[in-house]
Amino acid sequence: MRLISWNVNGLRACLGKGFLDFVALADADVICLQETKMRSQQASFDLPGYHRYWNSADKPGYSGTAVFTRTEPLSVTYDFGEDVHRHEGRIITAEYPDFYLVCCYTPNAQDELKRLAYRMKWEDDLRGYLCQLDLIKPVIYCGDLNVAHQEIDLKNPKTNHFNPGFSDEERGKLTELLGSGFIDTFRALHPDATDAYSWWSYRAASRARNVGWRIDYFIVSERLRDRVRKAEILADVMGSDHCPVLLEIEA
């Protein structure tokens, strides 16, 4: 089974930058999108062979997630936990016979960590949710998690320490998740890979110079470890300030 996750930073814009060509070439069974910034009724493009599910923010043109899947899920849900988490379109859970798929766009802690308190609540509630799902069947959790876990996961860790996405608090929450029976598939297969990033600022030619961060992940239940065949960053794919990430896992 082949899965793609991509923060498209506005799907309508990405459609004009080769999105459908990429989908055709990727030949993925499941495509998870973050930061779609659109509603399902605005999706005028054709995507034959895929069932499409959307979770849009209450605020137009903001946030949003989508899942395109060749196999129709048993069920699809669009929220978790308390009502506070249900207004920004940040999560879709698709249940399949043998696993849960969770597509997520994690809230950014924002400049000066203004939203860190909410981010911490999100992380705690989501970890509890993922652990509950994992008691029932294995979980594939993917998306833009808005955190570089270790120093190896961004170009300039020293100057970014305490910045949003690399604060001790955010990194610690990912450590807690990985200590709860989950693995970072990219690091499981590529423990020492350097200069492997999935997001680059639009400033200062950061992408051309590969001054980036790895903040997009496929995280899976520990018991799926031996079924992971490939976990890659598709850094050559343009269309957003993020690139897609890929997981191939034995069905």
Regions found by a protein language model. Give the residues of each.
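Conserved beta strand-loop-helix elements of the APE1-like EEP
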Residues: P60-S75, R203-D226
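Surface-exposed cleft-lining segments at the edges of enzyme active sites
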Residues: G81-E82, P107-E123, K158-F162
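Active-site-proximal beta-strand elements of phosphoester/diester hydrolases
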Residues: M1-N9, D98-Q110, C142
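Active-site beta-strand/loop signature of hydrolases that rely on acidic residues for catalysis
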Residues: N7, V23-Q41, L101, L130-E151, ...
